From Swiss-Prot:
Listed name of the protein: Transcriptional repressor NrdR
Classification lineage: Bacteria, Pseudomonadati, Acidobacteriota, Terriglobia, Bryobacterales
GO biological process, one term: negative regulation of DNA-templated transcription
One Pfam match: Zn_ribbon_NrdR
Keyword Membrane: no
Gene: nrdR
Coiled-coil ranges (or none): none
């Protein structure tokens, strides 16, 4: 590493420890030329997760946005915050697991509906009504019939 005082390229690490926040490694270095000491921080280069919208736009993955949609669907339902948080964690893991760190809103919506169907049927229907953008009561009724058929089999 280049010394900030004399621009010499060789140094030695005198001390190394985790930062107070735990998100970096703090290193004390000593220049082998001028013997002055300086501090460097080593951090993970975080590439943000991206969500590909239906119109092709990309925006940063927002955990709170996903959780907010789930909270609305589960309002006044017996679904714990821990379960919802776990579900958002699984979505986040799916994004981080993809090689390009991207996921489409379609994949997120389908994954959430699949999991909500198991968690709480009413929350599932509420979420589906917004996600699938039902235009009339017939579309809503068809989704309920589909859900009932799945329950019977």
């Amino acid at each position: 590493m280049k010394c900030p005082f004399c621009n010499h390229l060789h140094d030695k690490v005198v001390d190394s420890r985790e930062s107070k926040e735990g998100d970096a490694i703090r290193r004390r270095r000593e220049c082998l030329e001028c013997t002055r000491r300086y501090t460097t921080y080593e951090r993970i280069d975080e590439v943000p997760y991206m969500v590909v919208k239906k119109d092709g736009r990309r925006e940063k993955f927002d955990r709170q946005k996903v959780l907010g949609g789930l909270l609305k669907a589960c309002e006044k339902r017996p679904v714990s915050m821990a379960k919802l948080s776990e579900l958002v964690n699984r979505v986040e893991y799916k994004v981080s697991d993809s090689p390009d760190r991207e996921i489409s809103t379609i994949d997120i919506g389908e994954y959430l509906m699949e999991n909500l169907r198991e968690l709480d049927k009413i929350a599932y229907v509420r979420f589906a009504s917004v996600y699938r953008d039902f235009q009339d009561e017939q579309a809503f009724f068809n989704e309920l019939k589909h859900l009932m058929r799945q329950k019977m089999s």
